[in-house]
């Protein structure tokens, strides 16, 4: 690990900045919901699109974990699934320019499903790469710097996309232009990763066994008390995350949804997401990522309170707190899980965590979209508060810090 640490650290950072910048334009809870709402005029359709994006990432992590846990080298596989993920973003752009009506909606939804599938596979592969290449006490800072720089650029680009690309219909379709920009940025990052990484052989590997047999061994992973409780807490937090794409529509109902509002909310969310990353990363390196997870849940609760009760500038402040919470939640989820149990079980722990998260996030948006159409936003608000509080209670009383409990 130490022999090529400086090179691998720099390469991971550069790849992460480009990838984070591009994919934040896709995954920020503003642009995609607004795009689907433009195509359909339906909150239920926004829920379906978000659900497909998450559903694709529900099954693939387990398949990806089975692929990487018995390999000496993970990089070739990671490049393959990463490339396919970027192709799906390009398909979104081409479809937006060349199709219309039902054909455009069908291709867009299919692209979301496949984008989610390859995203789930990539997440397992790339986090396993980090576990091999970067020491545990430097992962937080690496992710913090990567997310801060990439997120800051993404926040500015999201503002530009809303106020110029979308509002002024650049190149004939502002959303297509935004998707194309995301494809270019993420592809540059993947190219840097392919050329720069020097990956050592895995220190320990599981023997290759049939997938069905490996799935049957999941019970062994769940015997780890803290990991089992963490999965429950993470699943509950994922329920609250389901609401993120709908909060833009919620604010839009109150203030009027247009390109300028989309750009401003995107900037508030992504800028907060960005600037908080160094704080979360340093906190995680020093005190452990359980503390980061707790802080992220508290920040999300504050954001929800401001969103529901606030007026004027407090509405924009709510997106700042939601962005702060989201960044900490994402960083802690993918880093804390690396520290439970044995090294050779990391791929499947990542797979289980991502599958639980994806399962909650795939069913939820459909139910939320239908609920909003029938009953308004009140059921979503109650469910988000309840799940965040339950997750916080589990993390406080059932999950120990793995660095001190081993």
Where are these regions (language model features)?
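Juxtamembrane intracellular "pre-TM" segments in multi-pass secondary transporters
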Residues: 1-6, 199-232
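Helix-loop boundary and gating motifs at the non-cytosolic
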Residues: 1-59, 68, 75-78, 85, ...
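Structural signature of the two symmetry-related core transmembrane helices
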Residues: 76-92, 183, 291-306, 385
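Transmembrane alpha-helix termini and helix-breaking/packing motifs in multi-pass membrane transporters
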Residues: 33-38, 66-70, 93-99, 154-173, ...
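Helix-to-loop junctions at the C-terminal end of transmembrane segments
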Residues: 60-73, 165, 276-288, 372
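Helix-loop junctions at membrane interfaces in 12-TM secondary transporters
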Residues: 9, 94-111, 308-319
């Amino acid at each position: 690990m130490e022999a090529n640490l400086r090179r691998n650290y720099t390469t991971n950072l550069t790849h992460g900045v480009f990838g984070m910048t591009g994919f934040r334009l896709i995954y920020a809870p503003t642009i995609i919901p607004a795009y689907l709402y433009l195509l359909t005029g339906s909150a239920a359709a926004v829920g379906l699109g978000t659900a497909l994006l998450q559903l694709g990432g529900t099954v693939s992590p387990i398949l990806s974990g089975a692929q990487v846990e018995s390999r000496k080298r993970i990089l070739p596989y990671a490049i393959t699934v990463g490339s396919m993920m970027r192709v799906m973003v390009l398909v979104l752009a081409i479809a937006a320019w060349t199709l219309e009506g039902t054909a455009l909606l069908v291709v867009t939804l299919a692209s979301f499903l496949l984008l989610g599938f390859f995203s789930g596979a990539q997440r397992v592969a790339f986090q396993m790469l980090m576990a091999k290449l970067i020491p545990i006490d430097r992962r937080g800072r690496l992710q913090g710097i990567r997310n801060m720089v990439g997120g800051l650029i993404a926040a500015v680009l999201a503002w530009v996309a809303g106020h110029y690309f979308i509002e002024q219909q650049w190149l004939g379709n502002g959303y297509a232009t935004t998707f194309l920009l995301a494809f270019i940025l993420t592809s540059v990052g993947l190219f840097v990763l392919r050329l720069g990484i020097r990956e050592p052989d895995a220190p320990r590997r599981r023997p290759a066994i049939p997938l069905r047999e490996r799935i049957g061994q999941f019970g062994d992973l769940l015997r780890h008390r803290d990991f089992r409780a963490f999965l429950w807490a993470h699943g509950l937090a994922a329920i609250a995350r389901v609401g993120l794409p709908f909060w833009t529509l919620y604010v839009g109902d109150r203030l009027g949804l247009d390109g300028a509002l989309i750009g401003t909310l995107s900037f508030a969310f992504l800028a907060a997401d960005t600037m908080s990353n160094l704080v979360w990363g340093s906190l995680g390196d020093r005190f452990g990522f359980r503390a980061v997870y707790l802080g992220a849940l508290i920040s999300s609760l504050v954001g929800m309170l401001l969103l529901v009760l606030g007026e004027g500038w407090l509405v924009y402040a709510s997106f700042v707190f939601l962005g702060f919470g989201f960044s900490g939640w994402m960083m802690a989820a993918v880093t804390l899980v690396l520290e439970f149990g044995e090294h050779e079980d990391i791929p499947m722990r990542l797979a289980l965590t991502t599958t639980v998260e994806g399962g909650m996030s795939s069913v939820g948006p459909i139910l939320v979209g239908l609920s909003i159409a029938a009953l308004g936003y009140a059921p979503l608000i109650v469910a988000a508060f309840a799940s965040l509080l339950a997750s916080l209670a589990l993390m406080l009383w059932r999950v120990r810090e793995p660095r001190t409990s081993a």
